[in-house]
Design a protein with these regions (language model features):
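Compact, glycine-rich, soluble single-domain proteins
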Residues: 1-76
Length: 76
């Protein structure tokens, strides 16, 4: 596994989704939400304990668990 994950982004930073490294269930759920390769994603907020994080993609905010964010890899 190489590259930076969504969890590594700083607040307000944007990046492009490169690939998702997770089980079928996670991948299908994220794909259904429009979280696909080539989509720009921005880190909007981090919950007080670091979980979940709030991201914005395709114009809407989405809460993603920390463990899932670590499986979404980015091209920066």
């Amino acid at each position: 596994v190489d590259g930076m994950s969504l969890y590594d982004l700083n607040l307000g930073e944007k990046a492009i989704i490169k690939y998702i490294n997770g089980d079928d269930k996670l991948t299908k759920r994220l794909l259904a939400l429009g979280c696909i390769e080539g989509t720009e994603i921005e880190l909007k907020r981090i919950a007080p304990l670091g979980d979940p994080i709030i991201v914005n993609l395709r114009g809407f905010d989405l809460a993603i668990r920390k463990k899932d964010a670590k499986n979404i890899f980015l091209a920066v």
